[in-house]
Amino acid sequence: MIPALTVPLLFLCATSASPAAGRGVLVPPDPKSKLIPSTTKGTHAIAKPTPSQAALRHLMVPADNFGLEMLTDHQRTRATHPQRQGQDLALPDKTRAKTKVTLDNNTGPRKVNSLSNREALAGAQPEGRNFIPSFFGNSKVHQDRSQLSSYFQLHTKSSSLTASQNLQGRKYSRNNDYGSMDHESNRPGKMNPHREEEVVSNSTKPAWVINRQPSSVLFQRPAFRKGFDNKEMCIAECHRDKDEREAYCNSDFAVNGIVQDMESVGKESRLLTLLVSSDGLYKMNRLYISPDGFFFKVKILVTDTLNCHKPCLDFKPGVRYIIMGQIYHKRIIFPQAMQHLLGGRLRAGDGFIKSSSYVQRFNRKRGRKVLAAAHSKCR
């Protein structure tokens, strides 16, 4: 028999030891709980609560809501289903590494399996394009690269075969198709389908025979045509005022110097030796000059291309001239008679002028115009 005074004391001790004390809820003491003596003398510790007691404590509803923290959904699920913790720990290492934590509307951390998302996305792809995700996967990289390269190789081969078949199937006629030819196909670097047969037939010949035209400046000049004599053209060309800037831009060299020597090469040509100072070299490019004391020697071939009664380019020894012309090179082809008369006296790099070239006596006004043309930009 327990005395009547000890029952209220035990009831008060149980209520003070419970976590819900002071919150308006009374919890009766558990008869299975025991007092375990601690290591220190005169003190006692309560035994660790069982999982059922911990779940009951978390699920208790407070009497008043003032100063109480709300429980999250995650904590409630863990309290009501404690066996799920063991399931999370039992997951394999690979699956646990592929999970990532996300937040959804501040309801707490949730685990999302990235592997399941990938499988769902792969299942949503259409069946006709099943090869596309395999190129971007982490496994079988070498096989995917070989598939991709083979796909593009087949595509290029098929396109080239179709283009060649279309080109072979067409038959062009020169009379009908040249009028409707596209100008874009006539650009350099593009194949002209109208001349396909000519290219095939001339493939055995060297390139310089097929593509090269005679680069002679004198090839179609009137001086080498028989019976050419036009007085009006001679007067117009010889007495025409020529623009310094236009002549400077259209010429390879521009100098002013004194005629030192003059040799006749046949009836229509002369070979000049010009003494030029350093100030008289307006434009040189690859003009060949040889030093001679304080001056430079320049050789210039003069040809009368108009074949007039009186030479259009009239030079006198000891007179200073402004001359603009072209530079001779080996691709310029002279008639065989003139080549025999020159006899190697004209070398590559020497000057070459004709009747339409700029030749004027030097004065200060013309000298300033040529200097202005030298400092201006050509169009």
Swiss-Prot record:
Compositional bias per record (Basic and acidic residues), positions renumbered to this chain: 180-194
Native organism: Xenopus laevis (African clawed frog)
Disordered: annotated span: 76-95, 162-194
Record-annotated disulphide pairs: C234-C308, C238-C312, C249-C378
NTR domain sequence ranges: 234-378
Family membership noted in the UniProt record: Belongs to the UPF0450 family.
Signal sequence region: 1-17
Listed InterPro entries: Netrin_domain, TIMP-like_OB-fold
Top-level lineage group: Eukaryota
Name of the featured protein: UPF0450 protein C17orf58 homolog
Keywords from the named record: Disulfide bond, Signal
